[in-house]
């Protein structure tokens, strides 16, 4: 009965109620995962750990709960996370095991060996589909080996995790072969996505291509002083509170802005590809979402990736609201209005995106589920905090802030995306009045 009520609440989008009930009746991988997430949201990590260990003992084949259990192990004893995936069952678990060894236990050689094993079993016919880890393995192996053959194959996939450093490395190969037109085209594409990026600009100037492509670069609308905080690779095991406390001590008058994706990662709500599948409804609605539109067509414009995002919308907002949003979209098109779908499904679902930083390029990242509670904990020592969603193309959006933050001023101060992009590893920016 509890499970049935939880499922009904989930269908209508009463997510927090559903999570509490799923924790009491974890009868499926989905229910157990969301139940554990709900416990973690409430600060009950020990209860979440107990729930995940119990379902793991009965249902070792459940993939979502297994990866969430690994998250909790990483925060306590990373070696247990490795043991959880030893031996790995299938290609995705080989990727996960390699990531755990390489990024968390710093046993780089062992991690690379597992990536190579997974690479040898790759199905290249479906390499552009989201649930094929080809793009992830190529990115990892290119970074650690600098193999030009692998890098060229990675570039040919035309994937959205081919980022600034990858572009610069590939352009170097093209230039060394005298293929300057292709090198220029690749950099041009990079500038479309990362406008004004210093890494790409330096490469462009070094090759003597003249004026940088004139894609409109957003500028800050204030005279605020911005200080980028280099954090290195933040992980689900990072202590964000101590980082915020240190930054606040160094800049007591500034507003500490944190990327919303970082908040979601710390909440544990990452949706790992390879652990779940899109539903029939998600596959049906996916091709109509228009994901991936733009000047350049990348693999993520394929309906397959869109279906995964719609599945995330369904899980976060509920089937009812997604159907209602789809109806609102049809009505909006008749009335020549845009944005009605996201107005219905809400900001948490709207924020869903695929991460590009290893090892989180294997995830869909929703908006923070309980951002008000999260920033209240981070601000316990007096820091003024804003959670933001900023990129080069669309500018800045303020998700929420602690009391006393002028959000309009802050939004204008961040319009030019001073944090940069993935390879910059500066997801925290302190903004101070002039």
Task: Annotate each language-model stretch with its function.
Residues 2-20, 24, 28-43, 174:
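Alpha-helical segment of the N-proximal tetratricopeptide repeat
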Residues 33, 37-40, 67, 71-74, ...:
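Alpha-helical adaptor scaffolds
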Residues 26, 60, 89, 123, ...:
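Short coil turns that delineate tetratricopeptide repeat
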Residues 16-24, 46-55, 78-88, 108-121, ...:
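Alpha-helical repeat scaffolds
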Residues 3, 30-34, 62-64, 92-96, ...:
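Start-of-helix register in tetratricopeptide repeats
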Residues 12, 42, 75-76, 104-105, ...:
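Structural motif corresponding to the intra-repeat A-B loop/turn of tetratricopeptide repeats
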Residues 205-434:
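N-terminal and secondary-structure boundary signal
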Residues 4, 34, 68, 96, ...:
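"A position-specific structural signal for the A-helix of alpha-solenoid helical repeats
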């Amino acid at each position: 009965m509890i499970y049935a009520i939880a499922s009904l609440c989930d269908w209508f989008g009463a997510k927090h109620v559903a999570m509490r009930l799923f924790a009491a009746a974890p009868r499926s991988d989905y229910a157990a995962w969301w139940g554990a997430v709900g416990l973690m949201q409430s600060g009950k990590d020990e209860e979440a750990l107990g729930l995940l260990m119990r379902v793991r003992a009965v249902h070792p084949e459940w993939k979502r709960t297994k990866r969430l259990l690994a998250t909790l192990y990483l925060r306590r004893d990373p070696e247990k996370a490795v043991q959880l995936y030893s031996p790995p069952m299938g290609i995705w678990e080989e990727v996960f095991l390699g990531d755990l060894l390489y990024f968390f236990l710093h046993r780089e050689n062992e991690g690379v060996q597992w990536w190579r094993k997974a690479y040898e079993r790759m199905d290249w016919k479906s390499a552009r589909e989201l649930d094929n880890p080809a793009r992830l393995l190529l990115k990892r192996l290119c970074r650690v080996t600098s193999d030009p053959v692998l890098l060229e194959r990675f570039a040919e996939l035309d994937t959205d995790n081919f980022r600034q450093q990858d572009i610069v490395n590939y352009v170097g190969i093209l230039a060394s072969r005298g293929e300057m037109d292709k090198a220029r085209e690749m950099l041009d594409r990079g500038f479309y996505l990362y406008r004004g990026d210093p890494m790409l600009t330096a490469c462009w100037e070094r090759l003597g291509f003249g004026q940088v492509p004139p894609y409109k670069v957003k500028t800050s609308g204030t005279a605020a002083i911005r200080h980028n905080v280099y954090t290195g690779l933040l992980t689900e095991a990072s202590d964000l509170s101590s980082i915020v406390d240190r930054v606040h001590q160094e800049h007591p008058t500034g507003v500490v802005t944190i990327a919303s994706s970082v908040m979601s990662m710390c909440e544990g709500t990452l949706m790992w590809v390879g652990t779940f599948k899109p539903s029939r409804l998600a596959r049906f609605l996916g091709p109509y979402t228009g994901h991936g539109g733009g000047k350049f067509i990348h693999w993520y414009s394929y309906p397959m990736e869109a279906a995964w995002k719609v599945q995330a919308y369904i899980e976060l907002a509920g089937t009812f609201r997604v159907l209602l949003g789809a109806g609102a979209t049809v009505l909006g098109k008749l009335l020549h209005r845009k944005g009605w779908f996201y107005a219905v499904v809400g900001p948490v679902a709207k924020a869903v995106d695929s991460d590009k930083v290893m090892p989180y390029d294997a995830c869909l990242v929703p908006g923070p589920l309980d951002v008000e509670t999260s920033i209240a904990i981070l601000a316990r020592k007096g820091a003024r905090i804003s959670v933001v969603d900023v990129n080069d193309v669309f500018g800045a959006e303020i998700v929420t802030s602690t009391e006393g933050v002028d959000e309009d001023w802050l939004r204008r101060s961040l319009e030019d995306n001073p944090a940069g992009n993935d390879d910059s590893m500066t997801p925290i920016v302190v903004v101070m009045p002039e």
